[in-house]
Curated annotation (Swiss-Prot):
One of its GO terms (molecular function) is serine-type endopeptidase activity. One of its GO terms (biological process) is proteolysis. It comes from Anopheles gambiae (African malaria mosquito). PROSITE patterns: TRYPSIN_DOM (PS50240), TRYPSIN_HIS (PS00134). This is Serine protease SP24D. Disulfide bonds join C75-C91, C199-C211, C221-C246. The gene is Sp24D. GO terms for cellular component: extracellular space.
């Protein structure tokens, strides 16, 4: 594939992105800081959901939350304690600046964005080494705890690596295919863990990342950023980016949760 064949992106990013197998795009609906600090409007539609898959039932993913800004879906996230949400770092940036906590509302407890329990955010904490698609995780501390129920429940963090070939479940809201209609309902799909070497070759990132593949026209898409990948009721990944386009044959990049457990626990203890 030549650069001319790829979706156009900021010129400042091309030198870095040419090192990998395809052009990477964050999965949020906001404009992101690209490698080198340049900004560009991604050539993708605003709004997205898991490509393919099925509509979730109430209580099926009690850890899943949505992040709203201006009453519009921005990203997903996972409840890991009653007052803490784990999401992607690029979900909490506007250009090079971290967005105010007051601009984010977290919705939990329903597969419908029109329902559920809403909580204001007290504190936004992106990983201090986030950049160039690396360390793409952030914590949100809620102003008030979320009540525990059959529909709202924190998920455990995976503390060990996930074997290649394992099947995970990914979930999120938005469009079911590139350019398709937006849904108000949470969707989920299955994906397969890629071997670490294959992940590195596809992304150019050697640490802190886990890659998943799905059949063509399945997988994560813009708007699913920050959302979970789970295995055996444990959170194993945080949605970060896609390569080339939604539902492509290329692997999707997720932050590897086991690599960030120490950072997560240390950060939460500080507040």
């Amino acid at each position: 594939m030549t650069l001319a064949d790829r979706v156009p992106l900021a010129l400042a990013a091309l030198a870095y992105l040419a090192l990998v197998s395809g052009v990477r795009f964050h999965l949020s609906e906001q404009n992101d800081v690209l490698p080198g600090g340049s900004q560009a409007r991604r050539p993708f539609f605003q709004g997205a959901r898991i490509v393919g898959g099925s509509v979730a039932s109430e209580g099926q993913f009690p850890h899943q939350v949505a992040l709203l800004r201006g009453n519009a879906l921005t990203c997903g996230g996972s409840l890991i304690e009653s007052r803490w949400v784990l999401t992607a770092a690029h979900c909490v940036y506007n250009g090079a600046l971290v967005v105010p906590a007051s601009s984010i509302v977290v919705v939990a407890g329903s597969v419908s964005l029109s329902n559920g329990v809403r909580r204001a955010v007290a504190r936004v904490i992106p990983h201090e080494r986030y950049g160039n698609f690396k360390n793409d995780v952030a914590l949100l501390q809620l102003q008030l705890s979320l009540p525990s129920s059959a529909y709202i429940r924190p998920i455990a963090l995976r503390t060990t690596s996930v074997p290649a070939g394992s099947e995970v479940v990914i979930s999120g809201w938005g469009r079911m295919y590139q350019g398709g209609p937006v849904s108000n309902m949470l969707r989920y799909n299955r994906a397969t863990v890629v071997a670490d070497q294959q992940c590195r070759m596809a992304t150019g990132i050697s640490t802190g990342l886990i890659c998943f593949t799905s059949p063509v026209n399945n997988g994560a898409c813009n708007g699913d950023s920050g959302g979970p990948a789970i295995l055996n009721n444990q959170l194993v990944g945080v949605a970060n980016f896609i390569i080339n386009y939604c539902g492509s044959a290329s692997p999707d990049g997720y932050a590897r949760v086991s690599d960030f457990v120490t950072w997560i626990q240390t950060t939460m203890r500080r507040y």
